[in-house]
Amino acid sequence: MPRSLRAELSKPYGVLFINENKLKQFLINKSNSRLITVGDVVTQTILKFHIKPFLAIVDGKTKRKLVKENFGQFEYIKVKNEPGLIRLSTIREIKDILVHNENDKILMVDGEEDLLVIPVVIYGNFGDIIIYGQPNAGVVVTLNNDFLKRRVLEIFKKFQVTSC
């Protein structure tokens, strides 16, 4: 990821929730949409609400510290994704899950999951609800739509291929 994108990617691309009860109520009202979570704390919070994500992407860490979480009844798929990068193999795994509508999956990332919101937006359906953590602020909830896809594609085009 180019350093020039750090500030851009640290902005929330959706509604920032700081209150768990309001987040829960919002999600209950959107129960017909596919829900995709990116991050360990976000995923654990959603599961605490007895809401099961269609896809959860986690790395076993919170703020770079290891956490021991039990995410329950999911099929676990291990992928590798180094910090600051998005591996093509990981993009393909996310695409396969989202395009083929394969729910109840957890991508367990060896590395870092933060940037994987990007392929989730690109390959997700219009209307998917994507939830990710905003460090030291709360939880961002965004509804996948044409504007978001275009904006994320613009950002993704600025990434550089480092190896093949």
UniProtKB/Swiss-Prot annotation:
The keyword Nucleotide-binding applies. GTP binds at D40, V41, V42, D59, K61, E113. Pfam families: DUF359. It comes from the Archaea. One of its GO terms (biological process) is coenzyme A biosynthetic process. GO terms for molecular function: GTP binding; kinase activity. It is an enzyme of class 2 (transferase). Its EC number is 2.7.1.237. Keywords: Coenzyme A biosynthesis, GTP-binding, Kinase, Nucleotide-binding, Transferase. Pathway: Cofactor biosynthesis; coenzyme A biosynthesis. It catalyses: 3'-dephospho-CoA + GTP = GDP + CoA + H(+). Belongs to the GTP-dependent DPCK family. Catalyzes the GTP-dependent phosphorylation of the 3'-hydroxyl group of dephosphocoenzyme A to form coenzyme A (CoA). This is GTP-dependent dephospho-CoA kinase.
